[in-house]
Amino acid sequence: MKTLYSLRRFYHVETLFNGTLALAGRDQETTGFAWWAGNARLINLSGKLLGAHVAHAGLIVFWAGAMNLFEVAHFVPEKPMYEQGLILLPHLATLGWGVGPGGEVIDTFPYFVSGVLHLISSAVLGFGGIYHALLGPETLEESFPFFGYVWKDRNKMTTILGIHLILLGIGAFLLVFKALYFGGVYDTWAPGGGDVRKITNLTLSPSVIFGYLLKSPFGGEGWIVSVDDLEDIIGGHVWLGSICIFGGIWHILTKPFAWARRALVWSGEAYLSYSLAALSVCGFIACCFVWFNNTAYPSEFYGPTGPEASQAQAFTFLVRDQRLGANVGSAQGPTGLGKYLMRSPTGEVIFGGETMRFWDLRAPWLEPLRGPNGLDLSRLKKDIQPWQERRSAEYMTHAPLGSLNSVGGVATEINAVNYVSPRSWLSTSHFVLGFFLFVGHLWHAGRARAAAAGFEKGIDRDFEPVLSMTPLN
């Protein structure tokens, strides 16, 4: 360790008992980071870091392909997807592959193709990762200057940012092209209970698209999570894709302005912290989106949302008791409010009882029964269709509640089934991942700022209390 420029810089790094453990320019002595610090050893080895990233991409794509094939192998077409613990097939079905009217799976072959394509891609990425980690050049700056970089080269960093933005924009347009030209996507709002359709009449009005961003995030408003038609979703992807591509070109062609050079920390760890913050925000938004939105995440595949299951229960018992002779328009509940129907604070007719808090819910099986002032009493008496009764009874018993041991549904509900909704899994996992990414952002941002300010060091070992204590033996 005597070759280090400054020992103090590494006081917080646990030293190895065997200082001879060397990894060809990636050992603790030359990098200041021990083996468990992972990619930190590769901060200045762009070629090896490329290998780590490509191999990581290979692992991700391998999981996608393997899990995809696993779900195909276990899939039972007669049961709804959300009863089978599937999290990948619902995404493929939402994109319009293999499904027909009502979300019924008519062909599992596209799912098989998807899994195989991902597996083959992962093999290519895996080979590239191993090549660059073990055989390729350690650094790219000399032999491939276009792919080389220095972390504090602000112009190069914004060029890399621009390339990433263009790739994200292309990704957004892939969804647009799928919806417009390549078979369409699944629309849960299609007449007659959902179907795959091409989205022709895109919403491109900036006041509508950016109006979502200006909405309140709270009940009844719901910010961007409140989007409930595919024209807006696909139109939003046109806007997003265009902004990403033009922003990417802008960042490639320009250098950072003086205020940005002053305001930001320009180091590898700082960029890591910015990325973690962005991913954290994405995780939290995805959590709310999959929990509340039944247009981007159709209930036919993901199961009902919480509010949807609750309103479905109120609807199911309204149907039952109306058949038994109850006057649902005037029956009084135990609190003195309407038992089946009541008015919201703004005057709409809504379901009564505990589900009143979910009066915002919009769902394809319920909307036909609404009039200009909320639920329409005459439609509730005359127009309820058998498919609406079946759908609501199914959703009532599949609430997205449940513990890890798969005792799903409302704890007191005798008709609940043994299942956990994919909505529960996807929203809780994205919340937890978003939280940990945020903690990682705080950690790396703190370290990056400290390093930039020049006071990055661990506990000061020179004046550590234990040094003045009597030896144990």
Swiss-Prot record:
Coiled-coil segments on the chain, per record: none
Family matches, as InterPro entries: PS_antenna-like, PS_II_antenna-like_sf, PSII_PsbC, PSII_PsbC_sf
The entry's keywords: Acetylation, Chlorophyll, Chloroplast, Chromophore, Manganese, Membrane, Metal-binding, Phosphoprotein, Photosynthesis, Photosystem II, Plastid, Thylakoid, Transmembrane, Transmembrane helix
Keyword Nucleotide-binding in annotation: no
Record-listed N-acetylthreonine modification sites: 15
Spans through the membrane: 69-93, 134-155, 178-200, 255-275, 291-312, 447-471
Any one Gene Ontology cellular component term annotated for this protein: chloroplast thylakoid membrane
Keyword hit for Lipid metabolism: no
Propeptide: 1-14
Localization per record: Plastid, Chloroplast thylakoid membrane
Modified residues (Phosphothreonine): 15
GO MF annotations in UniProt: chlorophyll binding; electron transporter, transferring electrons within the cyclic electron transport pathway of photosynthesis activity; metal ion binding
Gene Ontology biological process terms, A to Z: photosynthetic electron transport in photosystem II
Co-factor binding details: Binds multiple chlorophylls and provides some of the ligands for the Ca-4Mn-5O cluster of the oxygen-evolving complex. It may also provide a ligand for a Cl- that is required for oxygen evolution. PSII binds additional chlorophylls, carotenoids and specific lipids.
One Pfam family in the UniProt entry: PSII
Primary localization: plastid
Similarity-based family: Belongs to the PsbB/PsbC family. PsbC subfamily.
Protein role: One of the components of the core complex of photosystem II (PSII). It binds chlorophyll and helps catalyze the primary light-induced photochemical processes of PSII. PSII is a light-driven water:plastoquinone oxidoreductase, using light energy to abstract electrons from H(2)O, generating O(2) and a proton gradient subsequently used for ATP formation.
Subunit composition and interactions: PSII is composed of 1 copy each of membrane proteins PsbA, PsbB, PsbC, PsbD, PsbE, PsbF, PsbH, PsbI, PsbJ, PsbK, PsbL, PsbM, PsbT, PsbX, PsbY, PsbZ, Psb30/Ycf12, at least 3 peripheral proteins of the oxygen-evolving complex and a large number of cofactors. It forms dimeric complexes.
Identification of the protein by name: Photosystem II CP43 reaction center protein
Source organism: Arabis hirsuta
